[in-house]
Structure formats: structure tokens, C-alpha cells
Amino acid sequence: MTKFYYLTVLLLAIISCTTTPKTSVTLHIEGSRTDYPTFLNTQDSVYSITLDSTGTAVVNLPENFQPNYGMIRFGLMRFPVYLEPNKSFELSIKIEEHNVTPNFTGEGANKNIYLNSDIFKNNAPDLKVSEDVFLKALEEQKSKLIANLETQNFEQEFVKKEKKRIHYSLYSILPMYISYHPYYAKVDNYQPSEHFYDVLEVAVQEEPELINMQEYKNALNGYIELAANKNMKQHDGLISLKKQLNFIQNNFKSPAIIDFTVDHFISAYVGRYGIVNLSEFLEIYETKVIDSQKKSSFNALCNKWAKISKGQPAIDFKYLDINGKEVCLKDLSGKYIYIDCWATWCGPCRGEIPHLQKLEHRYKNKNIHFVSISCDQNKADWEKMVKEEKLGGIQLHYGGDNTFMNFFMITGIPRFILLDQEGKIIQANATRPSNPETIKTFDNLRGI
């Protein structure tokens, strides 16, 4: 009996010594709202988090995962985190009116305190300044962040990785500058200089070991989009995609990079334009994308677009116009309907307005409605612009209701939609007013 007892104790001791300790992330929310959607994103998983009655939840991570960055999402709030095996931590979030205070504790707290420090807040350079000033500000900000990193006494492996993250987080802003500089600087016909493209080419390198880092993926996608579409004067989604795929083929060798970028750009195209031209690049997708999860998501996306293909009925909407009158889609039946989904802060949207006004004038008294739906969160900005610039057509504000946008899977603006007299879809992603094909399409509409 004694021998059996000691043998059992010894066996349990051996098992306890060889069992890998669990790594957990504990989240605690203190405040008036604990019912926001809550998630933990890791490099390969998304954990949906349900808080208990005390506002607490625990996520146990799998054994033997690789150290990497993640993100805790609570409503619209984002908290970057670094996850390491055997280094559990707790994030307590105290919410008081408009103040949010995160507090990290536990063995894995140090790096997460660093990642959520004030130095990373509001560090984007001013988008209205000139290119030279903007690029100089980027470099200065990078130097500042790296100097701060080197005072933290982290191990060199993390420091090396974090320097890459800092670099790509800043240089992923370059495409944003090109899109928003004309709006903030109030300049027309802005074109990036050759130097700007040169800086981008040097800044973004082929680094497949970083393919799970979100900042790198953002910078890589932005680089490909800008470099491939360089000097492209007329926006055309299909031509742009062909240029992007050709650029990927000619400039990258890593299967991991090719797998990610081909899936990203073809999925983005289908997400915005639908499956009309799918046959032109389906073979490329099937041969270059090897990840089964990506392929499954892509097939699901294509199936969604089949539901808003030509001839399918559009979902109704009910929005207020500039005079406060309620307008429904069914109220507009009997005429063709050309819909512009836009916002005042969107530079490309504003760029289409003069072309849209020409269409409105050309087809005045014709059998077609021109409807503009603003998705501005600040309704006053929309009202001011509509009145000051005397915008025509039927001007509507979405009022926070995304049902119509979600039905048409609108992920970017401007987005144009063409419906027939019965409210059925002709084009779920119609050509823009600036595209000469739009007039050809209108002229071929029966009974316009």
C-alpha cells in the first residue's frame, strides 16, 4: 500500500512537471457599458468574448503558439497586445463617460503597457502639408518611436520585431496621404512626385516572415496598389486589378506573399465590383492562392454577390432628404435610379460631383432619378455642403442606418448603383459619372 501510494504521488508529480502551463488573457470591463461586441484577434484566430455578470472573461490560448501581436476589440475601442507563451496577463478597462483607462497586470503586462502608451496616440503626420514636410515628419516620428523602444529593456528578438512594426505602421500611411491630401489641402489634380514613389519602393520590402503582421500587410497592399496604378488617369476597377496582379507576378517571389496579395486584391475587387468579370481572373486565383481558409472565404463572398446580381430586387430604404422629408426607394419606382453612396470627407467622392452634375443636366427631364445617399456621421457637414454647393438630384442622409449599404456590401466609397423602373438591379456596382461608359449605359436604357 505504501509503495503504491508513493508511486502514485511520484507519477502525479511527473505529470504536473511535464504539463504545459496555460496562457490566458483575462479581460475586465468596469463602467456603464459592458455589452459591446468584444473580440481577441490573434495572428490565426478570432476569439469572440462573452463577459460575465461582473464584466469579466478569460480566454485560454492554445499550447505552443508563436509569440506575436494581437488586438483586443471592445466596441469601437482597440487595444494592441503582444501574446507570448506562458505569459498570461489581465486587461482592466475603466470607462467613465468619455474617458477610457486601460490597465495591464500580470507576467505578460510589460510589453502591452508599452504598446498602449500615449506615445502611439495621435502620431500620424498632418495630411494637408506638402510631400517633403510629410515625409520628413514620418522619419522624425519613426526616430522618436524607436528611441522610446530602446529605453524599454526588452529582449532583442522583440525589439527587432517591434522596429519592423513601427516602420510599417508609419509607412502604411503613404497611400492615405495620396487619397486625402487633396481634400485637406484643398488642391485639385494632385499627383504624387517620382520621389514619393521612390520612397515608397524603398520603404516596403518583400519580407515573408512578417506576413502575419497587420502593419506589414497594410503597407504591402498600399505599395502594390499605388505602384501598379501609377499614372493611371481614369479609374477602372478591372484594369486596376489586372495591373496589380501583373505587378505582383513581376516583383515578388515568395509563395506566402503571392498567396496573400493575390487573395487580397481579387477578393477586394469582387467585394467592390461583384462577379461579373470573375472568369477573367479565376484561374489566377486558383493557381496562386494555396490557403484553404482564404479559398473558402472567397467562395462565400462570390455566393453573396450572386444575390445582388442583375435582375435581383434591391432592398428598400427609408431616408430623410435635405428638407427633412422621408423618401423610400419604392417612392421612386417608375423611373431608372442612379444612386451615389458618398460622404463629404471622401476626396474621390467630391471629385465625382462635377461629373455627376453634368449627367444630371444631360438627362434632365428624362426617365431617371439621380439619388445621392450620404454616409456622413456628422449630418451638419452634409447639410452645409448640400446647401452651400447647391447639389442637385435627390439628396438623402443615411441617418446611421447601414441596412442598404450592407445589402450592397459597400466597403468603399464612392459607390454607384443602377436600378431599373421596378427597383431591380441593373448594376450593383455601376460605372462612375466620370467614366465615359456611364453615358453609353444610360443611352442604351430602354425608355429613358
Question: Which functions belong to the PLM regions below?
Answer:
Residues 351-389, 400-406:
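Structural microenvironment flanking redox-active thiols in thiol-disulfide oxidoreductases
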Residues 412-415, 421-448:
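Non-catalytic, surface beta->alpha helical segment in thiol-disulfide oxidoreductase systems
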Residues 320, 383-422:
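Short, internal strand/loop/helix patches
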Residues 333-334, 340-358:
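Conserved redox-active cysteine motifs that mediate thiol-disulfide chemistry
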Residues 182-201, 237-248, 276-286, 315-316:
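Alpha-helical repeat scaffolds
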Residues 18-191, 198:
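A non-transmembrane, solvent-exposed segment enriched in polar/low-complexity residues
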Residues 242-245, 258-320, 325, 330-335, ...:
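N-proximal helix/coil linker or "cap" segments that precede and/or mark the start of modular domains
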Residues 1-26, 445-448:
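Bacterial Sec-dependent N-terminal signal peptides
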